[in-house]
């Protein structure tokens, strides 16, 4: 038999294995089937091992083609990954970005990559680790793949989100022993299981290979009992471990061994144990038990090196080097084996993953009714966070799939109205705390768990909201950044991942500097240039409703709303607020004759407007014209060329025009003011034509008795701002 067309470019073919004619005469997954019928069937075991070695071979050749990439970690999971696919469980995610070449190999072997023009091995090598090709790490941009993976310790969130949205489907997530504690992998699953005890259809698959990237893993000294106990201690009722060492007939030393060095018979026995174990684990997870599967096998099994030395390839590790080419020869399969592997994997799960993965179609959203606004009068006072909470409650009552997450507690964020309406999800009913087992508010004391579930739900197509104290958002932000970047290249529409951070630094005087960390706004500010990230600063209770309504209507974006939980003045009408969110900024004050010069204050934030307004009144009394402009959506104030907006999915190329910008910000002096750091003011400073300009912003935290005292400590006072404006005007005239 000649090799199938997709094998064009494969460098080495091998001889048929023993019993090939009887065990691989035809695919064990027949036409019209989606999985093997019996995991105990010797033919199923045999063909699962063929798939495992095919995965290893493609992984090593494609990484060798560029002298780049990471073959070793995935290689030690090959039997488990092949087993999952052969059993029809193809909605697989991972927390290990370094397993990308293996996941790409799986998508190549099931035919999914043909959707992006990769039809054979030559195509795959050409497109590997290239722009518009197979990205360096996993992304939902690749047909058949559900979620991104780069930073360790995130994949479990995607598996849990998938399980919550799709009962009855299994969501395996591979986890490396190097990344197992990085930082909250098991902790987040434990929290989720407490809140959602009936959602067990996600399956952690621990790839326990004894090594991390450059050394022995920190759990390499665990014995099998200790590892099993560790998972049981985190709430897993069923822990199934298959240890390659128990099948070794090659006399390998150490606790971690390479199954590809076994005799053929022992390789089949090991594969049979893995296949049966994965099948048992899958049925357990789908049957209502929190379950984990562990494959224990040496890192680098079957590729060019072992242990941490197999982790990645360097430029010298190319296909013409003996250690690479000889390793490929050892894994080489006969031509007819490749046809068997393709037929099996393209049928597993009901078809190629590019057709059957749950993320290949948009999830239908529950239609929302017209949301009721609270219309606050300009000049009155209202709490922004509470105003938003009322709107959030309406969303949750209309969309029962909607989840709100908050590690610090909605009540502490002046958003108790969310808990009143939607209830905190907890197995202990308690009306005093608004707790119910079926609640829609997820409040584990773990920012990563909160951000992770919200981000995972948004990526997989459902509405969610992550709420946090601004000071502690940094502990959950990494997965939000991962998801916003994934959304930028997603091939489908999905709801924006929406965050609201309150209890800003100026509100936290008595709590001291541990609760005063607004510097994260600089992080968000830098990400605005990504093209699909928006940092919103509503100045009042009307504007925060406009900001949240805007976020609800957005797709494939990351939206961060920063607002206070304090009683503050209302500056904008609802219509003015909607316009400011859409266009980028809005005037909240304009007065004075202008005989002494025109001063413009460009302000991000709400509470910091208090001293700005005081400074404005001082200056107006001296004959100056003063405009106070609330910078509500600074992403809209950049110039188009400043932002990679045209490189992202669902692009937004609307920016404030020069004429509109100049109408708001033209003056003799422009002073940017922020209650946090200065980066969000960058677009204003880039575009202003004011001949004199300066910035007042946060410096550092301190324990104070009031917001006024804390602003004074940071130089954010009316007197300081007015004095600086006078000096700049004088400089302008000299």
Regions found by a protein language model. Give the residues of each.
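Short, highly selective alpha-helical patches that border small-molecule cofactor pockets
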Residues: 77, 103, 157-159, 224, ...
């Amino acid at each position: 038999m000649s090799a199938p067309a997709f094998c064009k470019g494969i460098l080495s073919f091998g001889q048929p294995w023993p019993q090939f004619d009887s065990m691989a005469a035809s695919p064990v997954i027949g036409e019209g089937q989606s999985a093997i019928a019996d995991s105990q069937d010797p033919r199923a075991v045999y063909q699962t091992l063929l798939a495992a070695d095919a995965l290893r071979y493609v992984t090593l050749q494609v990484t060798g083609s560029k002298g780049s990439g990471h073959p070793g970690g995935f290689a030690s999971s090959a039997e488990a990954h092949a087993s999952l696919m052969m059993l029809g469980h193809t909605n697989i995610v991972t927390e290990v970005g370094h397993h990308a070449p293996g996941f790409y190999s799986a998508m190549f072997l099931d035919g999914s990559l043909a959707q992006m023009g990769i039809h054979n091995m030559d195509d795959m090598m050409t497109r590997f680790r290239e722009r518009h090709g197979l990205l360096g790490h996993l992304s939902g941009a690749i047909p058949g793949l559900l979620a991104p993976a780069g930073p360790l310790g995130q994949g479990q969130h995607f598996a849990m989100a998938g399980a919550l949205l799709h009962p009855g489907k299994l969501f395996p997530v591979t986890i490396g022993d190097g990344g197992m504690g990085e930082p909250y992998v098991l902790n987040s699953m434990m929290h989720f299981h407490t809140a959602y005890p009936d959602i067990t259809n996600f399956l952690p698959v621990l790839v326990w290979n004894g090594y991390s990237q450059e050394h022995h893993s920190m759990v390499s000294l665990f014995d099998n009992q200790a590892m099993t106990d560790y998972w049981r201690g985190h709430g897993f009722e069923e822990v199934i471990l298959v240890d390659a060492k128990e099948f070794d007939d090659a006399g390998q030393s150490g606790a971690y061994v390479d199954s590809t060095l076994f005799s053929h018979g022992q390789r089949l026995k090991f594969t049979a144990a893995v296949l049966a174990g994965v099948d048992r684990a899958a049925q357990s997870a789908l049957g209502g038990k929190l379950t984990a599967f562990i494959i224990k096998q040496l890192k680098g099994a079957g590729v060019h090196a072992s242990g941490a030395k197999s982790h990645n390839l360097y430029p010298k590790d190319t296909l013409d080097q003996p250690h690479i080419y000889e390793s490929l020869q050892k894994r080489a399969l006969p031509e007819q084996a490749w046809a068997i592997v393709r037929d099996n994997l393209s049928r597993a799960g009901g078809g190629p993953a590019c057709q059957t993965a749950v993320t290949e179609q948009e999830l239908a959203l529950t239609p929302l009714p017209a949301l009721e606004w609270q219309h606050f009068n300009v000049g009155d006072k209202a709490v922004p966070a509470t105003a938003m909470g009322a709107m959030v409650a309406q969303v949750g009552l209309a969309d029962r799939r909607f989840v709100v997450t908050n590690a610090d507690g909605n009540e502490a964020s002046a958003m108790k109205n969310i808990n009143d309406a939607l209830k905190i999800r907890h197995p202990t009913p308690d009306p005093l705390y608004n707790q119910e087992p079926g609640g829609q508010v997820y409040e584990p004391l773990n920012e990563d768990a909160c951000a992770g579930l919200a981000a995972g739900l948004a990526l997989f197509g459902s509405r969610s909201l992550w709420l946090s104290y601004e000071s502690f958002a940094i502990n959950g932000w990494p997965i939000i950044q991962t998801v916003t970047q994934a959304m930028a290249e997603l091939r489908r529409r999905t709801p924006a991942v929406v965050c609201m951070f309150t209890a800003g630094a100026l509100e936290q005087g008595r709590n001291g500097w541990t609760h005063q960390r607004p510097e994260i706004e600089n992080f968000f500010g830098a990400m605005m240039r990504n093209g699909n990230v928006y940092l919103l600063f509503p100045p009042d209770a009307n504007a925060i409703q406009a900001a949240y309504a805007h976020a609800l209507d957005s797709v494939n974006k990351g939206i961060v709303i920063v607002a206070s939980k304090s009683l503050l003045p209302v500056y904008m009408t609802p219509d003015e607020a909607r316009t400011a969110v859409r266009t980028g900024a809005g005037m909240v004050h304009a007065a004075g004759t202008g005989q002494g010069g025109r001063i413009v204050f460009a302000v991000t934030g709400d509470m910091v407007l208090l001293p700005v307004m005081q400074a404005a009144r001082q200056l107006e009394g001296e004959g100056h014209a003063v405009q106070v402009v609330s910078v509500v959506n600074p992403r809209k104030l950049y110039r188009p060329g400043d932002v990679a907006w045209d490189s992202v999915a669902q692009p937004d190329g609307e920016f404030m025009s020069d004429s509109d910008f100049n109408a708001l910000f033209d003056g003799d002096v422009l002073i940017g003011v922020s209650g946090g750091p200065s980066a969000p003011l960058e677009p204003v400073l880039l575009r202003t034509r004011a001949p004199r300009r300066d910035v007042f912003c946060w410096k550092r935290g301190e324990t104070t008795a009031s917001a006024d005292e804390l602003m004074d400590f940071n130089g954010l006072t009316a007197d300081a701002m007015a004095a600086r404006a006078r000096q700049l005007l004088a400089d302008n005239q000299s």
